[in-house]
A protein has these predicted regions:
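A broadly conserved sequence feature marking short terminus-proximal activation segments
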Residues: 1-17, 207
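Conserved acetyl-CoA-binding loop-helix of GNAT-fold acetyltransferases
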Residues: 84, 182-186
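Mobile, glycine- and charge-enriched loop segments
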Residues: 159-180, 199
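Active-site-facing substrate-recognition patch
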Residues: 8-14, 22-108, 135-168
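PRPP-dependent phosphoribosyltransferase catalytic core
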Residues: 185-247
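Residues at alpha-helix caps and immediate loop-helix transition turns in enzyme cores, especially N-
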Residues: 121-126, 183, 214
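Glycine-rich phosphate-binding loops at beta-strand->alpha-helix junctions
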Residues: 113-122
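Residue-level signal for inorganic ion chemistry
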Residues: 107-110, 199
Length: 247
């Protein structure tokens, strides 16, 4: 692990206390007066992760948002790759936190494949970073999009296949960006159908579109209140950012 600090433009997905009731309790999307956003509320139980961690918020057109695209482009930006690697490293430092929340240790990791640019046998940029940074000895579980499946944002576990049966008690699903969440929850459901008893997720960036729904008002208010903070030192798996093992 490099130990380098995250660039200052990355924003923690943990908000000050007075704003926390205004984001979905599962995916942290801004909502108006509801515990869950529409998509998370409508998702079947089998598709909801047992714990969901978010390292940062990435606001559309911001430097952080651009990095989440540039790190996996046709000609990846070295700077963006390094920054996304730092997000991954930070999230992986909190494996003990998700272990405690779920009640059993992570026994294997699944890295989310691209549905729009999937090539069998060709690792994605995120899979390459995970191969470098995952703890030694932690097995990986393969998952593949079904032929013809598209990024339609629907929650459909049948849109993924897990080639080998999964007998682990706890599988961690890692992805770079959560937009609608449909793809992530579909993968969670597929892992459960393959035999995983518990499935948690770690997302490096929760995407925010300041032109959508309740997002612009919340982004403006948090900005005016000086409420954004760095992901550094914040637990991605808890709503208050406090590691459960030290409560």
């Amino acid at each position: 692990v490099s130990g380098r600090p995250l660039p200052g433009f990355f924003l923690s997905a943990v908000l000050p206390r007075r704003f926390r009731s205004r984001v979905c309790r599962l995916c942290r999307r801004p909502v108006n007066g509801f515990r869950y956003c529409y998509r998370c509320n409508a998702a079947p139980d089998v598709a909801r992760p047992d714990a969901a961690g978010f390292v940062s918020y990435a606001i559309k057109n911001s430097q952080a948002g651009q990095d989440m695209y540039r790190y996996k482009g046709m000609q990846p930006s070295v700077q963006a790759v390094n920054n996304v690697q730092l997000l991954l490293e930070h999230g992986l430092r909190h494996l003990r936190c998700v272990n405690q929340i779920v009640g059993t240790n992570v026994q294997a990791v699944t890295v989310m494949p691209s549905r729009s640019h999937y090539q069998s046998g060709a690792p994605s940029q995120l899979q390459k970073l995970c191969a470098l940074r995952l703890p030694a000895g932690l097995p990986t579980v393969g998952i593949e999009p079904v032929a013809g499946a598209t990024s339609d944002r629907k929650v459909d576990p049948a849109s993924f296949v897990v080639p080998q049966p999964v007998g682990w008690s706890h599988v961690l699903l890692i992805d770079d960006t959560w937009v609608s969440g449909g793809t992530r929850m579909s993968a969670v459901g597929a892992l459960r159908a393959a035999g995983a008893a518990k499935v948690s997720s770690l997302v490096l960036a929760r995407w925010l579109d300041p032109g959508y729904g309740a997002t612009p008002e919340l982004v403006r208010e948090v900005t005016e209140a000086g409420g954004w903070s760095s992901p550094q030192g914040v637990c991605p798996f808890t709503r208050d950012g406090v590691c459960p093992r030290v409560r």
